[in-house]
Structures are given as C-alpha cells and as structure tokens.
Amino acid sequence: MNPEKDFAPLTPNIVRALNDKLYEKRKVAALEIEKLVRDFVAQNNTMQIKHVIQTLSQEFALSQHPHSRKGGLIGLAACSIALGKDSGLYLKELIEPVLTCFNDADSRLRYYACEALYNIVKVARGAVLPHFNVLFDGLSKLAADPDPNVKSGSELLDRLLKDIVTESSKFDLVSFIPLLRERIYSNNQYARQFIISWILVLVSVPDINLLDYLPEILDGLFQILGDNGKEIRKMCEVVLGEFLKEIKKNPSSVKFAEMANILVIHCQTTDDLIQLTAMCWMREFIQLAGRVMLPYSSGILTAVLPCLAYDDRKKSIKEVANVCNQSLMKLVTPEDDEPDEPKSVAQKQTEPNPEDSLPKQEGTASGGPGSCDSSFGSGINVFTSANTDRAPVTLHLDGIVQVLNCHLSDTTIGMMTRIAVLKWLYHLYIKTPRKMFRHTDSLFPILLQTLSDESDEVVLKDLEVLAEIASSPAGQTDDPGAPDGPDLRVNHSELQVPTSGRANLLNPPSTKGLEGSPSTPTMNSYFYKFMINLLQTFSSERKLLEARGPFIIRQLCLLLNAENIFHSMADILLREEDLKFASTMVHTLNTILLTSTELFQLRNQLKDLQTPESQNLFCCLYRSWCHNPVTTVSLCFLTQNYRHAYDLIQKFGDLEVTVDFLTEVDKLVQLIECPIFTYLRLQLLDVKNNPYLIKALYGLLMLLPQSSAFQLLSHRLQCVPNPELLQTEDCLKAAPKSQKGDSPSIDYTELLQHFEKVQKQHLEVRHQRSGRGDHLDRRVIL
C-alpha cells in the first residue's frame, strides 16, 4: 500500500493502524473510525460516510495485503456500528467486500470476515433481508469450511440471521427458493446440515408458506435423507415429517400432482429409509389427493408392486406399499370406462402425462432397481395445481397395462407381486371392461403362460382373470377394438374359431351350473378362444396337464358355466389331430366329470337325459369321449345308457387290447365301487329292469385278467339277487315294468358307428408309430 496516498477523511494514524499485523492496533483504528463516522452521521454528511466505506472497501478489504484486508474488515464493522439504524442505507457497500473475503485462502481472514459480517447484521437486523440471498450463499459455503474456528464463527452468524428471519414478516421467499433449490443438491455433509436447518426454521415461521414451494425442494430433501450422517438423516426426517403434517392439515392447497413422480422415483431406491419415507408419503398422497393421482398410476405401480414381495426384513415397506396398492385400486371406478370425450386445447395443455418428463436436475435420484421402470417415473412433471384441479382426471390404461404385463412376464418377480398384478387385472376388467378388452389380445398369452406358475394362489387368481375375460359382456364383439396406443401390440397368432357348434356355445340354452362369473352367465367371443388356447397349452405342456389340468378345469367350472366348458372342450377335441393327446384329455375330463364335487349339478343333468339340452350335451361329449373306449363306457354308465354301454363293450373285442386299455378298465371297476355310482349299484337289485347293466358289467369282467379288479367286480356281481327270489305276490300280480329304454331322440346307431370310426383312426395311428419303431407310452395319466 502506498503510504503517500491520500485516504482522507481517514487520518494517517488510522491508516497505519489498520495495516498493522497486531489485532489490538487494528482494533484501536476501528474505534477511531467508529468515532469519525458517528460525527459524520451527526452532521448528516452522507458523502463522507460513503467515502469512508468506499475507502475501507477498495483500499483495505479488497487489498492484496492480508493485514490490510483484516483492517478493512474491522473498519467496515466499525462503520456499521457507528451508523446504527442508518446502516441499512449502506448495506450493499458494507456487505459485498466482506462476503468476498469469505473466499480468502487464509482461514484467519475468513474468521475475521465472519466476525465483521456478524456485527454488520447485528446492527442492521431486518434491513439485511433484501440481501438475504447473498448472505445465505456465503454462509452455505462457510458451513463446510475445514477450519473449526471459521465454522464456529459462521454458526454464530447463522443463528443471528435465523433469529432475524423468524421475527420478520418481510422475508422474500419467492426470490430465495431458486437458491435453495440449487444448494439443496450439495453432497457436502455440513452444507446439507446447513440447508436442512434453514428449511426447518422456515417451516416453523407462521408467515412463511414453504409448502407452496415443496415440489421444488422435495427431491433434494429425499437426496439428503440418504446421507451417511445419522444426525443429518434424523434432521431430514423431522423436516419431512413437518411438511407431511402441513399437507394433512391443509390438503386443498397442496400441489400433489407436481410431486407424484418425485415420490415414484424415491419409492424405487435401494435405501430403506428413503424408500419407506417415500412410500409413506405416497400412501398419504393417494388417500388425500384421490383421483388426482390416477394419471400417475403406471409409475406408482412400477414402484409399489415389487415391494409387495419383500420379506420380513422389509416388512414396514411392504405393509405401506400394500396400503398404497389397495388405495390406488379403489380410485378406479366404472366411470373410467366411459368413452373419452374430445379434449379442448386448454385441457390438453393442463392434463398431466406421466410418460412425459422434464430433464432431471443435477443430483436427482435414479429411477431405482426395478426391471420394469425404464419407461415410468423417470422425471418430474411441473404444472400448476389450479389447472390440474380443473382438468379432467383420466385413467391412462395403456401405461398401467404395460406395467402389469411387464411384471407378470418377469419370472423373477415374487409371488405376492404376481398375485397383486392379477388382482389389478381382474379389478380393471370389472371396473373398465370396455377399455380393457382393447388390451386382451396382448394379455392373453401371458395369462395362459401364468397357468404354469408354481403357486396355486397365483393360478387361482389367473383363472379368475381369464374367467372374467371369457364371461364379460364387453367381450361379446369379435372385434374388441384397437388398443389405446401402438405400444402394446404384441405379435400373436389370431385364433380362428370354428363356426359349427359355436352358436350354441356362445348363447347356451341353459345357464344351470353357472356359479362364479361376476358379470353374466353368458359366454362371450373370448370364451371359445380361451378354451382353444387352454387345450393348446395342455397339448404343448403335458406336465402342466398332468400336474395342474384337473385343478385348472375344476376351478373354471366354479368360475364359469361347467356345461359350456365341457361342451366346448368336447367340440374342440373332436377336431384334434393329435389323437393320443385327445385320448389323454378325454380321460382327464371324464375323471373330473365323474369325481369332482364341483360338477354335481352337471352329473345330475346327464343322469336322466330328460331335456333336449342334456341330450345335446351327451351327444357332444360322446363324440369326443370316443377317443377313449373305457371313458365312453363310463359316460354311458353315468347317463344310464346301459344298453349302449353293453353294445360298446361288445365292440371291445374288435379293439387292440393293450396294457393301458386294461389299466383303464381296472380303474373303471374301482370307480364303480365309489359313491358316485351308488345309484348304479342299487339298480343291480332290479335285475328284471336292468338286464343290460348286468350284461355290461359282466362284459367288463370278461375283459379283465384274473386281477384284484376282477375279484372286486366278481364279488359285486355275485351279490346280484336272483330275480325270482325277489318277486312278491304283489309284484307277480302287478303288470311288468318296462325297463329304462334309450332316449328315442338320440341316434345310438350313429353314435356306435362314430365310435368305430374314431377307434379305427386310433388303431391306424398306433400302427404307424409301431412301423416307425416308436414304442407306445404305457404310462397311465391320472
């Protein structure tokens, strides 16, 4: 510094003392400056005051010499003290050089800068608020200062500034938010602590409504919640808790839609605390905002569904996710199935689209670990809540179905998630069937594939969805409509439904036996497609048929019309080219028909063949049952067509008797001893009126080798009474009863010819296989 330079009105002694390396001498100079400025204030000499401040700023505080800078800082503080309440007129000139020194490399100088600014702010109090942003900016940097003395000094200044903000009603929150939004993404632990402490202060001030600006800082708060420091995480939890209290207290003013995607992002993080907190917020948002959250359903489901499969280690997250899932599901109503009305330009601009997102700010969290989240929840929508309230809330089924399809296709997804997905699909088919049927062709393959799931509960839910698809009135048309969007089109072969016999299937003459369809007993166009696809699945996956076939068919009989299921499957099997599969499938269906409690009503319908409907069903079943000779006989036993059963058994002499054949005869004998054929065994008492029943049973006996089944049937037939011994005097006087005859409306001769034709086809196929050296599979499929 040039000693010859004129620093008036500062005296040479003051200048010399300000440049001294000793603090005490600089302090003496500061007292002189304070006295000098007080005189200028008394004289109202603003020009000289400005000149003193400018000199201290330019020639000292911003000097290259460190001791001069220290002198300038203490001199500026002295000016502020001397100015008192008038310091507000000169705050810009007083503050700026001090803040510049915050960046000084010398830690002692940074400390003196804190001290100087503390004195300036202490005098000015509320007058510093117009300069709050620059003060906050400087303090946020010092909060992370490595020197403990500097940090201690900045904390004193920080507390003073917080007191001023708390007691003032003139805080400019609007201009502060951009700075807060920027600084909240700091990764420094101390800077984060500083930010959180300030947010906590602002939230506590009644006159400051920080809730309006929560969408701009919420993402940053969740970032801080993942800090390694336990204390910072705890502070952040408190802040988020305070915000949530305010949201619950006044939900009408909350911009839920602007924060929805932020929560979606953080619900997918790997940090347990962040995920649980975000999920709790999501739960409250869904319950408080209601249908405002519907446009974000796809993103919410992407975040929530995987959590439902968590184990007990993440039980809390799982429970909250389950509440979110249930609450969101309840928001979907039948009104969402109404045709979409053309939107005005204003509505198009204000309606949120969850798949459109703004570029992510620096420091924003990643989308999370989920395999299906690449298209959802990757950004943050920003729009005003007022417009959102006016815009109609639309359910975006395209995105929801895509998420559900994705999760159901992922074999690594847990059982509870798969069940939740199927519950969602079922719910959507119930509430919005018209729109959902646009997606049925893309969903059908994966729903069929899910039948192979290892969990019975998953298969049950899957069958409920398939049954609803097959029975919903919305599926009556062959052309369910184009998808909502091009993204969901999946390559699949379109099924060609045979026209013959279909009319009766789609409009059944009787609805008896229907127990489970929540929509209607009438089967729609998808019912027949479902039956075709199900049989194709059984044909290609024989293990599925063996392990789950009876279970699946029995459940479908509960959910749908059992008569229609058997009628349609029999009709399809009649055209089956794989005769071995047809025989196996007929055997499976026959076992279900004869033994399942679910088919009690259908069995009763077939017992008497008194109605045209039952006769039509018998003929349809019979033609397919001909693929398996023994099942054909059992069907005749069930329907009490004993004469025709006897005629069939007579034809067995012309068939190729194999081990499999004899095994099935053995099983039929065992079945005759079961409760299902109690009526048949009782009819053996009426020998006179049931001669063909006895003949048929003797025919089976003659087919069997000397085995346990032979002994069983032989003992049963030995119990048949002598008809002459049963005659009483009244019986002899009475006119002879006519035995139960075959139904005159059924052409049994034609049925017998059909049986011979089908069995001839089976014989030819077996001979072809034998000629190729293939051995018959002797395994009996139960």
Swiss-Prot record:
Highest taxon in the source lineage: Eukaryota
Tissue: Ubiquitous.
Domains (record comment): The C-terminal domain (residues 523-782) mediates pentameric interactions and is necessary for the formation and maintenance of the PI(3,5)P2 regulatory complex.
Residues recorded with modification N-acetylmethionine: 1
HEAT-type repeats, residues: 5-42, 89-126, 171-208, 212-249, 438-475, 560-598
Residues where Phosphothreonine is found: 11, 499
Main location: membrane
Region (Disordered): 331-371, 471-519
Its biological purpose: Scaffold protein component of the PI(3,5)P2 regulatory complex which regulates both the synthesis and turnover of phosphatidylinositol 3,5-bisphosphate (PtdIns(3,5)P2). Pentamerizes into a star-shaped structure and nucleates the assembly of the complex. The pentamer binds a single copy each of PIKFYVE and FIG4 and coordinates both PIKfyve kinase activity and FIG4 phosphatase activity, being required to maintain normal levels of phosphatidylinositol 3-phosphate (PtdIns(3)P) and phosphatidylinositol 5-phosphate (PtdIns(5)P).
Keywords: Acetylation, Disease variant, Endoplasmic reticulum, Endosome, Membrane, Microsome, Neurodegeneration, Neuropathy, Phosphoprotein, Repeat
Protein known as: Protein VAC14 homolog
GO cellular component terms, semicolon-separated: cytosol; endoplasmic reticulum; endosome membrane; PAS complex; presynaptic endosome; vacuolar membrane
Result of altering residue 156 to R: In ingls; loss of interaction with Pikfyve but not with Fig4
Residues that bear Phosphoserine: 517, 743
Region (Mediates interaction with the PDZ domain of NOS1): 773-777
Family named by the database record: Belongs to the VAC14 family.
Gene3D superfamilies the record matches: Leucine-rich Repeat Variant (1.25.10.10)
